[in-house]
Amino acid sequence: MTKTKIIFMGTPQFAATVLKGLIDSNKYEILAVVTQPDRKVGRKQELRMTPVKELALTVNLPVLQPEKLSGSVEMTQIMTLLESGEVGIVTAAFGQFLPGKLLVVARFAVNTHASLLPKYRGGAPIHYAIMNGEKEAGVTIMEMIRKMDAGDMIAQNSTPILEEDNVGTMFEKLAFVGRDLLLETLPKYLEGQLKAQAQNEDEVTFSPNISPEEEKIDWNKSAREIFNKVRGMNPFPVAHTLWNGERFKIYESKVADEIVNNSDNPLQAGQIVEKTKKSLKVATGNGILELLTVQPAGKPKMDIVSFLNGLGQKMQVGDKLGD
């Protein structure tokens, strides 16, 4: 059997799961793997490889790591590979725009995008799906064009978003959904058995990369909205507020009460309204939010009981979180 020649482009664990599927299928000859450069992470600023690079090195695949594709040495290498014959491009959460000339030369170019397009085009589709309270998310296999995530759709599959899900759990679920969908549909697409369908431009929504401002909790929002924001940013980039003028990260929470604050119940948004040895509750613009896992400035992440037994002893009912 002649293997389909491809160049794979991807960066996080989501992409590594897709790449592993392509490798294990034994249907593809992967000429090169393109991923983001190694980055310094954590307090110690240790240089870390991307999950895609780690996987590629274990199976001796050539790895290219351009800071930016356009005008790079790696771009020239990729063009040489594409011009050598019938070579396609497969991407999954790569994190860079592909120059148009790559799309022209490639035999085909398909992307594994973690949303139910045309909803949530952009770099943070899973985050926004959860933050917006969606009940399901999914993956779309799509043709790549010069416009971001706007190509025709080859296939799509969905999975529920549960109350206990966060960005981390959904990334993991959708990685396997994407892997299986790509492996199932790519051969059929290349054989002409599947015809790509245009996206409905009237239904397009966007999910741009999360800005630092977006990470801040607005306590005037409802408890339900803040709950969705917290899980829509866990484990990264993590929603935060201020306590005593310092950053206070919130990883997990739950809606304790969705009552409407009114004149008979004049709670101030961001105010601590209940504190016991095991729980901490905060008023919002509409309802009460219970904090479950937090990280005070300069401290490790901890469950709320550990916080209340330590630094949290200084926190009192009536204190206010936020600006």
Swiss-Prot record:
Q: Which organism is it from?
A: Lactococcus lactis subsp. cremoris (strain MG1363)
Name this protein carries in UniProt: Methionyl-tRNA formyltransferase
**What InterPro entries would the database entry show?**
Fmt (IPR005794), Formyl_trans_C (IPR005793), Formyl_trans_C_sf (IPR037022), Formyl_transf_N (IPR002376), Formyl_transf_N_sf (IPR036477), Formyl_transferase-like_C_sf (IPR011034), Met-tRNA-FMT_C (IPR044135), Met-tRNA-FMT_N (IPR041711)
Task: Name the family the entry cites.
Answer: Belongs to the Fmt family.
Is Protein biosynthesis a UniProt keyword of this protein?
Answer: yes
* Top-level taxonomy: Bacteria, Bacillati, Bacillota, Bacilli, Lactobacillales
What function is annotated for this protein?
A: Attaches a formyl group to the free amino group of methionyl-tRNA(fMet). The formyl group appears to play a dual role in the initiator identity of N-formylmethionyl-tRNA by promoting its recognition by IF2 and preventing the misappropriation of this tRNA by the elongation apparatus.
Q: Which Gene3D superfamilies match?
A: Formyl transferase, C-terminal domain, Formyl transferase, N-terminal domain
Has keyword Transferase?
yes
